[in-house]
């Protein structure tokens, strides 16, 4: 699906997946074009309690002063992968991505993000939190790219995970690719089990 958000417009999309059938493959693609001062809010909630396989891809192109916010709640399907590619093409554009994994029963969920800071004075914020139990696995791969023209970039990325079972697995791959020298970018990841 293609969405064009004109100047000073806003759009809120709430995707709730609660499929009752035993086995499905679901593939979604959204292409968002945000013009000046546009605001996008996208909520992705997966509550399917079955053997579904789901893949979701968002491409977001942002103009000056636009804001995109993506929230992912991931606790349903057997296998789920969310990918977000965001291109900050206008000054003072901002992208915010928040994700929560709450997994059990041998589920495998992934979030992969790529935030591309292409001009000056752009901002991104990514925060992913996970609670894993019963042989489940989650993956977070987040990339912040800063082009040579993207001075004054502010990029932040953090992932945290609590492992409730010794057979769970959390893999984090934070990436920074920076070609400008006047930027503020950081990334971090922490995971561990609770004390007995």
Please describe what each predicted stretch is.
Residues 1-196:
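Conserved beta-strand/loop scaffold segments within soluble protein domains that form the structured core
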